[in-house]
């Protein structure tokens, strides 16, 4: 008789932990094409046998947004996030790399939780990849006090939340007062004209940064830009972009200016489009100017460092100046930009990862473009001695990638973070500034 024929008659609630383990190791090798064919374990049983829980929900729910009214918030302790919706974007090699990164072996006990359909999809894919000891986590999300979440998950909103807010429905972490939505990008609103989130305004990044070094504009210019778009210090601003880092650049500068509540649509325009939510065409709506910001600018000057302030962070154990540039940029085989000629890196800077080149941020993204798990990011940084109790300032070429990373660190609860505005462009413009080139490891920044 096939082993899976035995499953319908077995109640895992009535068997001992030893029997549960036996079922996990023996029966899970049977078909896992649907969640109801897998044995069920509790978290304590899974932990006793060094197993791993995998959350198959969207990262928004993993991070802390409730999936329904008054629903649980967060994820099980040390759970990994492998959303069923990502599977189409993950080839076998990428899935294998993901498993290797998280030390998953074919023999690792794995318990899935989420909805049944998502669990079944992830189980089938894992089984095809050689993972045979699969189960369902029977008590998942049942104990609110043990759940973990992103400390400031509300700063990274997700599409349905924004749509519900626009529809006037009650939402978790609702803005305290007036709120606005903007798309941010460089230059004229080309893509915006064709399709954008209904009601969204448009902000050209040239309004917050300028040549010759693409540093932020003066505080007076920043005040004028905010007034033009009807933004006060107490306006909740929700930003999105075709490129997340464009929206993040604007968001970070708004926080510097003193806008108290600035949020990003996690994953940007792509996540809205993928969700199949309404869109509209046309020119940006006229914004009613707001002549008074209502507070001094800058409200948080510590969020933006100049070159001398950045230099003061080098070679310190209580601080990190962090390069958010690709590895080829970090070791000096490319500058990453057509308009930046010098190649190399700030001597003593720590590598915070980024992506394959100056226009990508894969190291920080899930397959759908949303923020990777905080545990993964923190582990990546820890390997280069970048720690949450330090004073940390991020930089890249001109500030976009650094700003996206800043927004993630802020959501993770890293309190003493900033952006070195000038970045490699300004640092390399002075030949007296020390530069490093070539392959090197974390010890180079000690």
Question: Where are these predicted regions, by residue range?
Answer:
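Cytosolic catalytic domains that perform sulfur/thiol-centered chemistry
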Residues: 33-446
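Gram-negative bacterial Sec-dependent N-terminal signal peptides
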Residues: 5-6, 10-32
């Amino acid at each position: 008789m096939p082993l899976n024929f035995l499953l319908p008659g077995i109640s895992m609630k009535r068997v001992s932990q030893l029997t549960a383990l036996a079922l996990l190791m023996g029966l899970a090798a049977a078909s896992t094409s649907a969640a109801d064919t897998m044995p069920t374990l509790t978290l304590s049983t899974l932990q006793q046998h060094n197993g791993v829980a995998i959350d198959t929900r969207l990262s928004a729910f993993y991070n802390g947004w409730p999936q329904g009214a008054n629903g649980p918030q967060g994820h099980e302790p040390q759970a990994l996030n492998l959303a069923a919706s990502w599977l189409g974007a993950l080839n076998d090699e990428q899935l294998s790399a993901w498993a290797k990164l998280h030390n998953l072996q074919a023999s690792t006990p794995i318990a899935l939780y989420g909805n049944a359909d998502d669990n079944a999809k992830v189980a089938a894919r894992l089984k095809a990849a050689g993972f045979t000891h699969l189960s369902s986590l029977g008590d998942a999300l049942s104990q609110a006090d043990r759940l973990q979440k992103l400390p400031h998950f509300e700063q990274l909103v997700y599409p349905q939340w924004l749509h519900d807010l626009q529809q006037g429905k009650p939402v978790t972490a609702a803005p305290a007062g007036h709120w606005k939505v903007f798309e941010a990008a460089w230059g004229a609103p080309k893509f915006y004209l064709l399709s954008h989130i209904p009601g969204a305004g448009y902000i050209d990044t040239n309004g917050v940064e300028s040549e010759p070094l693409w540093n932020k504009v003066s505080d007076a210019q920043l005040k004028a830009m905010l007034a033009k778009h009807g933004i006060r210090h107490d306006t909740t601003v929700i930003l999105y972009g075709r490129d997340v880092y464009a929206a993040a650049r604007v968001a970070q500068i708004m926080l510097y200016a003193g806008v108290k509540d600035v949020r990003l649509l996690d994953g940007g325009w792509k996540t809205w489009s993928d969700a199949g939510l309404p869109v509209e065409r046309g020119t940006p709506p006229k914004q009613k100017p707001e002549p008074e910001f209502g507070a001094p600018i800058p409200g948080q000057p510590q969020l933006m460092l100049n070159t001398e302030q950045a230099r003061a962070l080098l070679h310190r154990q209580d601080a990190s100046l962090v390069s958010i540039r690709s590895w080829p940029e970090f070791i000096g085989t490319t500058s990453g930009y057509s308009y930046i000629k010098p190649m190399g890196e700030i001597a003593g800077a720590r590598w915070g990862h980024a992506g394959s080149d100056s226009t990508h941020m894969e190291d920080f993204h899930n397959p759908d473009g949303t923020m990777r798990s905080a545990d993964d990011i923190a582990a990546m940084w820890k390997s280069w001695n970048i720690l949450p109790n330090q004073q940390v300032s991020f930089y890249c070429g001109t500030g976009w990638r650094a700003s996206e990373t800043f927004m993630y660190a802020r959501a993770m609860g890293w309190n003493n973070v900033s952006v070195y505005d000038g970045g490699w462009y300004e640092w390399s413009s002075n030949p007296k500034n020390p530069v490093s080139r070539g392959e090197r490891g974390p010890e180079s920044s000690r």
